[in-house]
Amino acid sequence: MATNSSTEQSLTKKVWNLATTLAGQGIGFTDYITQLTYLLFLKMDAENVEMFGEESAIPTGYQWADLIAFDGLDLVKQYEETLKLLSELDNLIGTIYTKAQNKIDKPVYLKKVITMIDEEQWLIMDGDVKGAIYESILEKNGQDKKSGAGQYFTPRPLIQAMVDCINPQMGETVCDPACGTGGFLLTAYDYMKGQSASKEKRDFLRDKALHGVDNTPLVVTLASMNLYLHGIGTDRSPIVCEDSLEKEPSTLVDVILANPPFGTRPAGSVDINRPDFYVETKNNQLNFLQHMMLMLKTGGRAAVVLPDNVLFEAGAGETIRKRLLQDFNLHTILRLPTGIFYAQGVKANVLFFSKGQPTKEIWFYDYRTDIKHTLATNKLERHHLDDFVSCYNNRVEIYDAENNPQGRWRKYPVDEIIARDKTSLDITWIKPGGEVDDRSLAELMADIKDKSQTISRAVTELEKLLANIEEN
């Protein structure tokens, strides 16, 4: 009998080999994974009927058996009609098939995907195996530069370390307001699933504890299926398709885990008009930070990946940082190295904060200076962050001005932070080992672009200020 790991490896290889074949026909990896998702759900529904005698969740005439009976152009027509019907349902199925469209219009290749799925028994496969196969495909898609999917993918080792630090508990609610393919929610679920709890709490974890939001229909489909394959949200998806920033949070949550999108809002997005926000700004990351600050219950805690400019930007950035220190306990900042994200040149940090008490001191862990990771030769692994997690839990300062000035873990009293220009949190103390800048051209260009955007926003704010002075 094949082991779970061998089943996982062989099936992943099989699925990805077909992806490579379809790519040669102009069918991108993202389109392939989306169609795979649509078809896999149909197949698992059919297995549920056949093996367990359950009633099909798919309307008669549009089930798996109906689809595989067709060939040629009739197959394409039947598939497209099925997608249209299912996208209009108001349940988990409707979420998975949100704005579903067929992207494999050549019958021979559509049949290949259907045949591959039909050859396997998916429902009886261990949930962890199904989920691992699907996640590995999502990760491979994130690595594909042409797909652009890397923007939705946070490195799993970083997610795991963040969850280990936040320590979510059974009975708590966990939200990711920019959930991508669901990595944070799934990791939090796995973490809590291992805790002993009553049946009531286990049911709560499966059906009500998790909540994700994303404004891209395709990503909502992938996230919903990712969680469904792990047994989460079997009746209604915990993922909703909307723009988190457009309205005030309807409910408060215990835990927030997120890596909101960097950069400006996409073209065509609704302008942010939030009376509950502390300050008006067009900076996407600052708006997400405000939104998450307002989402937390008293006693709630958050771990959020944010770019460097959030730490030092003037104007709105300074206002938000002051509110964060005043109304929240911003207790820890993890400074991340470049080279760990699929989008090149990203300089980011993880901010850990809780609601209820003002900040008294901030602990910094510098995992950036003299740290070099690349996706090809020195990929970030969970063990690379072991020392940080240990420091986070133990709170014993490693830095010592005389004996260990290169120590990566040190604390600053909040008064010292407030006294800094613009209440800047952009702090480094470790002297680099060399003077050579070994960043790639892409990383250098990204850094220049980031600084240019910051300067541009500062000029805009200054122009507004001068205009107000002239009017008065």
UniProtKB/Swiss-Prot annotation:
GO terms for biological process, alphabetical: DNA restriction-modification system; methylation
GO molecular function, one term: DNA binding
Reactions this protein catalyses: a 2'-deoxyadenosine in DNA + S-adenosyl-L-methionine = an N(6)-methyl-2'-deoxyadenosine in DNA + S-adenosyl-L-homocysteine + H(+)
Enzyme class: transferase
Function: The subtype gamma methyltransferase (M) subunit of a type I restriction enzyme. The M and S subunits together form a methyltransferase (MTase) that methylates two adenine residues of an undetermined sequence. In the presence of the R subunit the complex can also act as an endonuclease, binding to the same target sequence but cutting the DNA some distance from this site. Whether the DNA is cut or modified depends on the methylation state of the target sequence. When the target site is unmodified, the DNA is cut.
Subunit structure: The type I restriction/modification system is composed of three polypeptides R, M and S; the restriction enzyme has stoichiometry R(2)M(2)S(1) while the methyltransferase is M(2)S(1).
Name the UniProt record assigns to this protein: Type I restriction enzyme BthVORF4518P methylase subunit
Species this chain originates from: Bacteroides thetaiotaomicron (strain ATCC 29148 / DSM 2079 / JCM 5827 / CCUG 10774 / NCTC 10582 / VPI-5482 / E50)
